[in-house]
Amino acid sequence: MKIINSMKKHYKLRRFLKYAKIGGGFSLCAQSNCFADKKGLITIGNNCEIFGTLYSMENGKITIGDYTEIRENSFIGSVDEIKIGSYVIISNNIKIYDNNNHPTDPKIRKEMCKNGFYGDAWRWNHSEHARVIIEDNVWIGERSTILKGVTIGEGSIVGCNSVVTKDVPPYSIVAGNPAKVVKLIEH
């Protein structure tokens, strides 16, 4: 089993190197993944651990600062721009999208179903999108979702199972669906 996991990690590293600019001290696991329509749209800082999936479609940029961790089964999908600062902890099973993932127009959705999953209508650029910014020293709790157009301020915490639909002020704790400020953090 160790040999198989080692082979998977080597294969995944090659995929990351194909699509991303990676800083020193990079770590991944057998479940790590990286996909992009174009090379060079994903940038990963120094001493990062990426145990989830990064997905850039069209011209979607993903930038990750230094000493940031993205844990298992997390998915970051961009068609616009997602900026993640340094010293950020993204827990397990997190979803971060800078887009609606599917168009809201019923005619386009009907076309999607008629033409199958790999048709052009399934591309994220057909859905509404807006950049996501996660500032430095943020902790995102397990099973949370961050939606398009959101900025999470420096030093903030997103509680487990939260759905973040609006900006989070710096040094605050948010929780719930939709996420609301439940406490301020002294700093």
Can you describe what each PLM-predicted range is?
Residues 1-115, 119, 124-137, 144, ...:
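Domain-scale signature associated with acetyltransferase and cell-envelope carbohydrate enzymes
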Residues 149-151:
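Active-site/ligand-binding-proximal alpha/beta "capping" segment
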Residues 156-157, 173:
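Alpha-helix N-cap/helix-start motif at helix boundaries, enriched for small hydrophobics
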Residues 165-171:
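Gly/Pro- and small hydrophobic-enriched strand-loop and loop-to-helix capping segments
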